Amino acid sequence: MSTTLLSAFYDVDFLCKTEKSLANLNLNNMLDKKAVGTPVAAAPSSGFAPGFLRRHSASNLHALAHPAPSPGSCSPKFPGAANGSSCGSAAAGGPTSYGTLKEPSGGGGTALLNKENKFRDRSFSENGDRSQHLLHLQQQQKGGGGSQINSTRYKTELCRPFEESGTCKYGEKCQFAHGFHELRSLTRHPKYKTELCRTFHTIGFCPYGPRCHFIHNADERRPAPSGGASGDLRAFGTRDALHLGFPREPRPKLHHSLSFSGFPSGHHQPPGGLESPLLLDSPTSRTPPPPSCSSASSCSSSASSCSSASAASTPSGAPTCCASAAAAAAAALLYGTGGAEDLLAPGAPCAACSSASCANNAFAFGPELSSLITPLAIQTHNFAAVAAAAYYRSQQQQQQQGLAPPAQPPAPPSATLPAGAAAPPSPPFSFQLPRRLSDSPVFDAPPSPPDSLSDRDSYLSGSLSSGSLSGSESPSLDPGRRLPIFSRLSISDD
């Protein structure tokens, strides 16, 4: 009885091991299939057919863990005789058959892992080999047309080994030119070799050598691209330009120059037509005179005729913007002397400035002093016209009332007029220069008549009003002198 029970338990253990070995064999056969999703061919003696198996799927483990039982296999479900008969034939094989079946069952897990890892490694290696193969094919295709690899530099330089020894180990595949007939022209930047190399001209050495894109020697210079000027001479000093032998570019000339008072300041050339050597390099010497302005506009009322004549002699012949010329023209028109046409004529000569008596005045020192004086004395054209009209309107009113016309102040000896022009009276009250220029006899106000009253209050008020109209601070004036307009007003009041 006990022997029968032991044999039954032994048979059950043997059958379980046999089923595991068969399941491992079926799994190994399945992994050998390369196509994913192909049906697994079931053994004719077994009913294990889980259907389609997918790689890395969790349902496969469930199918393998619970296989379908085969009809010819031993199972504890079958009772008594069937179990004993089927197992007896299996046990007839002895321990040898059990050992042969036990070996694959014991190494089944290791074989399964090795097979899976081998399959994975082979799949990844196939992809890597395939990518490397494709890359190799692409390189071979590109190697057939060498100009496509580096078309910008291909055959643009001579092959040094070929030039030295006449042979090259690369042969036709060499990307350098074997002779001048293979040399290609390289497309360069528009500014290639148009600017100086800073490194070479600073330390005398350039690490790029002949491949540098900037100028090392004078013979490498190329013409600048159209539409833009090269800044090589601007970036470096005159020393580098003279060292390389490049011609020095002329400085651009300015066509307009504004003084601090907001009006164009004139600059006349010397009579010879050439600039002095000292003024050649100065920035102000390269400013040409504006056509509608004159440096002689800074003269006072005593020299208004001289300044207007010199202003009218400009090449443009346009009316000047100086206040004194406008006042002189207004005076000539009101009094009917006919001198305005002569003064404002385009070709009217300046006899006063060309005479010997003007040799010692302030304007004989050249245009530099006149350009400095101009911003101090220049007035706006509107203010000059309004002031002149107001002055002569008051004079006409006095004449209509039966008063005698005021005595004209004597002109200084230096102010000589042309032969065809009469001496127009000049209003001295609104065109008087500040006192800082009163050292010169030209800028002094004409002396007031001896019979004028010395009204200090009117003098001070007049100086303040004139200073406010001119827009500049009126400096301290000589208290012993009076403006002629206030002297005439005091006479008319009496």
UniProtKB/Swiss-Prot annotation:
Sequence ranges of Low complexity compositional bias: 416-435, 459-478
Residues where Phosphoserine is found: S57, S125, S490, S492
Zinc found in the keyword field: yes
Gene Ontology biological-process entries: 3'-UTR-mediated mRNA destabilization; cellular response to epidermal growth factor stimulus; cellular response to fibroblast growth factor stimulus; cellular response to glucocorticoid stimulus; cellular response to granulocyte macrophage colony-stimulating factor stimulus; cellular response to transforming growth factor beta stimulus; cellular response to tumor necrosis factor; definitive hemopoiesis
PANTHER family: CCCH ZINC FINGER/TIS11-RELATED, MRNA DECAY ACTIVATOR PROTEIN ZFP36L2
Pathology linked to this chain's protein: Oocyte/zygote/embryo maturation arrest 13: An autosomal recessive female infertility disorder characterized by embryonic development arrest and embryo implantation failure.
Subunit structure comment from the entry: Associates with the cytoplasmic CCR4-NOT deadenylase to trigger ARE-containing mRNA deadenylation and decay processes. Interacts with CNOT7; this interaction is inhibited in response to phorbol 12-myristate 13-acetate (PMA) treatment in a p38 MAPK-dependent manner. Interacts with CNOT6L.
Record's protein name: mRNA decay activator protein ZFP36L2
Organism: Homo sapiens
